[in-house]
A protein has these predicted regions:
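Intrinsically disordered, low-complexity basic tails and flexible linkers associated
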Residues: 1-157
Length: 157
């Protein structure tokens, strides 16, 4: 953990049990400050994809700590982007709250499905039933969904 990351964790009042978690050994890659839109975009690097609980805690504390200054965004960069089915599916509900994937039609259809993975490679399949408009969703929503997953640290997806 570098000093800047440590200072950020102090500012977020991150609990000791999280800070001592080996999965939470991070660094600040960069911070982009968008003055006009008042958004601070944090790029944080971790050894691997964070568990959903660690990610939610981090995102929440960033949002709260900077709420009087700006909105926050966080992109997780990982050294090891491997994942399993459980980790991938744990992040899926967050996807449906994010821009581009939060439309009622998309969430109503796809929130009932789960990803399957064959191995720890970059292969994940969303098994869906027979949908007449599947091509539309694949073209318009799946690339956005993939980008959101990449922002969570799923670099190999």
């Amino acid at each position: 953990m570098n000093d800047l990351f440590e200072k950020l964790m102090d500012q977020l009042d991150m609990p000791a049990e999280i800070r001592q978690n080996p999965a939470f050994r991070g660094n600040i890659d960069k911070v982009e400050v968008h003055a006009i839109s008042k958004v601070w975009h944090f790029y944080l690097k971790f050894p691997a994809i964070l568990s959903i609980d660690l990610y939610r805690e981090l995102a929440y504390r960033l949002e709260m700590a900077f709420s009087n200054i700006a909105k926050t965004q966080v992109t997780i960069l990982t050294e090891d982007g491997r994942f399993d089915e459980t980790l991938l599916n744990n992040y899926l509900p967050l996807i449906f709250d994010l821009p581009g994937c939060d439309t009622p039609s998309f969430t109503a259809i796809f929130k009932k499905y789960k990803f399957t993975t064959a191995d720890q490679a970059a292969t994940a399949k969303l098994l869906v039933g027979d949908l007449s408009n599947l091509e539309y969703f694949v073209k318009h929503y799946f690339p956005v969904m993939a980008k959101h997953y990449q922002d969570f640290g799923f670099t190999d997806l």
